[in-house]
Amino acid sequence: MEELKKYPSMKLLPNGVFYHDEIPEKAAEVMNRTQKANPQIGGWALVGGWPLFVKNGIRWEPGRAKIVACDALPAQLEYIKSGHAQVLIAQGCFMWGYKSVELLVNKIVLNQSPTEVKIAAPLTLVTQENLDEWSLNWKKWLLKEAVNR
């Protein structure tokens, strides 16, 4: 709320926080129903990407209301491509798993303790400009090249 005060042209609706079950279809329905009832909404900040996990879940024209969401999973990338979402805040999911296994192997096999108490994983802002590059990560992480050979 403090950050919002820096942008006087942006207003939060009086009932501007909308909750939903963490079920993609229900989340998309809440978002669509709310947008239809409040056409003045110019943007959405999604803490969870649930509404974007459904194919064709957003039923308004691209650009009508901007969308920024957490995660940049394969299902969500289509919303960047279509112009419905402007930014996805990507977490390094693959790195989390890779680094965790690496630390465990080093401890169990080499008896090496981690050198850092906390390991920060950088976030990546995925937009139309870097969508193709980010999408390649999923092909690599999900071994699509190996499967498609």
Predicted regions and their residues:
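Hydrophobic alpha-helical segments within soluble ligand-binding/sensing domains
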Residues: 1-2, 24-28, 72-76, 91-112
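Sec-exported extracytoplasmic/periplasmic mature domains
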Residues: 5-9, 32-39, 81, 105-109
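Residues at the C-termini of beta-strands that transition into short coil/loop
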Residues: 16, 71, 92, 123, ...
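Hinge/cleft segment of the Venus flytrap/periplasmic-binding protein
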Residues: 95-149
